[in-house]
A protein has these predicted regions:
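A structural signal for multi-pass alpha-helical bundles of membrane permease subunits
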Residues: 1-282
Length: 282
């Protein structure tokens, strides 16, 4: 099954990337031309690299900001703060809501004409904002929406790992007089390295492959000044014909997917190699 659903599609995409093909009819072999156009053509490569830059920027935000927040929330649940069961439910709930529904409510909330946020601004005498129509705000707002929806997933991975910490270790720390913060730094963090590695690799793959939410919020073109443009949206436009002479080109789209496959594979392997060398003691 792994071969059928993973290995075969990868090699088939590599094969198609060497051809010009609309998805129907005969394939025309073009060699590495699709890759040359993608990486060096002045009409297309700036769009691709701008989208890749957005992916990388989003990946950094996820790893540097969102992941530590997820860990912190997981620890608060682990030490059973007051109402921890309620918070656990509320933090994880957005993840089970459809991305389409989340995006719909986000567009209503930040609508420049009828949105709640602009009503709040005008009620205190401030000017309305175009929000997602403002290229300086759009990316930040998208990150906030994604964080609200997805923060519970990484949090639950960390929390599940913390639940596996042996009771004997915790009891020994209590006998030694450790408070919650000392227990965090000397026991919980070292023993959470495996789940941290899982979260980092999963978040990286997710960030470099994001599509649905920015597509709904900014449209297929990536919003104003391509502020919400990501590589998978570039793939969508060029593969299905809205940006490449109005014609579908599965070969060019496959070239984009092959490039991204090697980027994601390389980054994930480097992360896995570095994280596997981290030793922890308690």
């Amino acid at each position: 099954m792994y071969t059928v659903f993973i290995i075969v599609p990868i090699f088939f995409a590599m094969f198609i990337s060497l051809h010009e093909w609309s998805g129907l009819g005969e394939m025309k072999f073009t060699g590495l031309e699709n890759f040359r156009v993608l990486l060096t053509d002045s009409r297309i490569s700036p769009t691709f690299f701008h989208a890749l830059k957005n992916n990388i920027k989003y990946m950094v935000v996820v790893l540097v900001i969102i992941t530590p927040i997820q860990f912190g929330l997981a620890y608060l649940l682990y030490i059973k703060i007051k109402g921890h069961k309620y918070y656990r439910f509320m933090l994880f709930l957005p993840y089970v809501i459809s991305t389409t529904i989340v995006s719909f409510f986000a567009t209503i909330l930040f609508d420049p004409n009828i949105g709640f946020m602009n009503k709040m601004l005008t009620s205190v005498g401030l000017e309305k904002s175009s929000w997602f129509g403002n290229p300086k705000l759009a990316f930040t707002l998208m990150v906030i929406v994604i964080m609200w929806q997805g923060i519970g997933t990484g949090m639950m991975i960390f929390y599940a790992n913390m639940q596996d910490i042996p009771d004997s270790v915790i009891e020994a720390s209590m006998i030694d007089g450790c408070n919650d913060w000392q227990r965090l730094y000397k026991i919980v963090i070292p023993l959470s390295i495996p789940s941290c590695a899982t979260n980092i690799i999963m978040s990286t793959i997710w960030a470099l492959g994001i599509f649905d939410l920015p597509y709904i919020l900014g449209g297929a073109t990536g919003g104003v000044n391509n502020s919400l443009d990501f590589v998978n949206m570039v793939f969508y436009r060029y593969t299905f014909g809205s940006a490449l002479n109005g014609q579908s080109n599965m070969g060019f789209g496959s070239a984009i997917s092959v490039v991204m496959f090697f980027i994601i594979f390389t980054v994930s392997m480097i992360q896995n190699r570095l994280l596997s060398k981290v030793e922890y003691e308690y």
